[in-house]
């Protein structure tokens, strides 16, 4: 929005002929790096400014977190802490993105739309848990249906409304590989890939959101790495130099990712231990959906496990736990567990680690994964 008013209108109308430093200075609005930086700052400030009123309103509405009985006493003390704070993240991301991005990018609106749809699924889940007093929220089939519909819409827009490249960019390889165009593999097969990515990423972040500051801090790190990747993919010189799939449409996704960075950092201000608010499913599903959607749009699908390595580890720990329990129950008659409790952060907690230590160590691991994802740009 600001791009059109301050650059397209004021600068182009008055900047070239005016001697005013104000009008000439508006030239900076054409640069995606400038707009990304300010989208980050704007989202951060919105989250910080509105955080306290939102938390207070959630508390007044008695939108408190329910804690499962089997969790530790440390977790039981958090019962009643306001949840659904993810609306603060999503709202600040939407406002700052609309303010600072060019609004003629269909990829930008696709990322925003997918994020909002995943947020809607999470909101419904939280609402049923809290207001309807149904502890499990949406049924598994209902939640899956919402996620599948969103994935189908993402694929549909890519197929019918864009010139999206149906190729997969493989890390560590010089050439873009595995063509999946119509002549080789129909794009309908790519739909399965999109479903796998979006459902996997959204649920992985959802599983990670179990400790004060954990999901928000890991999101900040993962989104910072994804911001850098979207920028180099959008710049022809960097893309050619690093042998990436060049996608100029992803430039505005950089602004979107920057807004996510700022919003997650601002939310961490209130979510750091001891947490004053939790993001809830409305936040975690939306963040995971945003990560997956941007990875798909920028052809970084295979880098997503590195970008969000902690999220993947948490999800895999649950898969291992459930699979092993079912297998041993079927074969031995008694279900056995690999971990004391899944996701993995609960295993360490029951092992005697204090929550802040677990969070800080997971943050260190997230930083290492982010650096690894960025290093692949040169390892081709």
Task: Kindly label every feature range from the protein language model.
Residues 2-53, 93-120, 154, 158-175, ...:
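Alpha-helical transmembrane segments
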Residues 67-81, 135-143:
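Juxtamembrane helix-capping/reentrant segments at transmembrane boundaries
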Residues 78-90, 142-150, 253, 355-365:
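Select subsegments of transmembrane alpha-helices in polytopic membrane proteins
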Residues 120-127:
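Alpha-helical transmembrane segments within multi-pass membrane transporters and channels
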Residues 129-138, 171-182:
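Membrane interface segments of multi-pass transport proteins and intramembrane proteases
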